[in-house]
């Protein structure tokens, strides 16, 4: 756990990690490289993050907060919360098509236990707020269990790069159809959500997220 005194060190390590992960990939980046380029001692790194997967969990937290923030801005406060979910997941999936090393980061995040649990638990809280009215009999725990399944769908699509037949637009339509049906969203509303996202410049929005 980082203290207030270690916050500048933590920030410096994270900045170095983002640069290295995007340039050469998560798996190819070693702890030795991170420590050297951050200018910190091995003990300082381990006190804050324990290991490289600790950095990944921290980055995942930042990325998800940023994605939901951008999604809320793109969806506007006037639209139902389901649109925020659609834009957030569209951003996430689009990011993996913009940068192969970013694809690796997300896939690793959905694979490593600590990072994956963070994703599922935090997403479940959002899902409960967004979809609770569609299935009022379900608890937040129920939505956590549903998220385990929808996260698996998300990971599957992220792991499969787009091609001439499976375009990004088609991938998003398929994901929305499956996930929103699981949350009991009416078919007509699913159609409206899909058309809304297709009307956005989702690649530009995702690039803005990546720059942050």
Regions found by a protein language model. Name each.
Residues 103-108, 188-192:
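Short, hydrophobic secondary-structure boundary micro-motifs
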Residues 71-75, 103-106, 157-165:
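Secondary-structure edge/capping motif, primarily at the C-terminal ends of alpha-helices
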Residues 58, 69-102, 122:
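Hydrophobic alpha-helical connector segments
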Residues 109-159, 170:
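Amphipathic alpha-helical packing segments from all-alpha helical-bundle domains
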Residues 12, 20-54, 58:
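Helix-turn-helix
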Residues 129-133, 159, 163-212:
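C-terminal peripheral helix-coil segments that are non-catalytic and often amphipathic
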Residues 59, 63, 67, 88, ...:
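Hydrophobic/aromatic residues within well-ordered alpha-helical segments
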């Amino acid at each position: 756990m980082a203290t207030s005194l270690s916050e500048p060190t933590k920030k410096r390590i994270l900045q170095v990690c983002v640069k290295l992960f995007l340039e050469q990939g998560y798996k190819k980046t070693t702890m030795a490289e991170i420590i050297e380029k951050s200018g910190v001692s091995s003990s300082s790194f381990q006190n804050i993050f324990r290991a490289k997967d600790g950095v990944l969990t921290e980055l995942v937290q930042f990325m998800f907060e940023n994605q939901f923030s951008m999604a809320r801005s793109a969806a506007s406060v006037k639209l139902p919360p389901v649109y925020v979910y659609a834009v957030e997941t569209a951003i996430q999936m689009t990011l993996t098509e913009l940068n192969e090393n970013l694809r690796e980061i997300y896939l690793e995040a959905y694979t490593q236990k600590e990072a994956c649990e963070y994703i599922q638990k935090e997403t479940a809280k959002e899902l409960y707020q967004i979809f609770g009215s569609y299935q009022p009999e379900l608890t937040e725990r129920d939505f956590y269990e549903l998220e385990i399944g929808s996260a698996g769908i998300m990971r599957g699509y992220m792991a499969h790069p787009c091609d001439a037949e499976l375009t990004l637009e088609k991938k998003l339509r398929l994901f929305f159809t499956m996930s929103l049906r699981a949350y009991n969203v009416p078919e007509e509303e699913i159609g409206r959500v899909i058309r809304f996202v297709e009307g956005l410049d989702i690649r530009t929005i995702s690039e803005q997220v990546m720059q942050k």
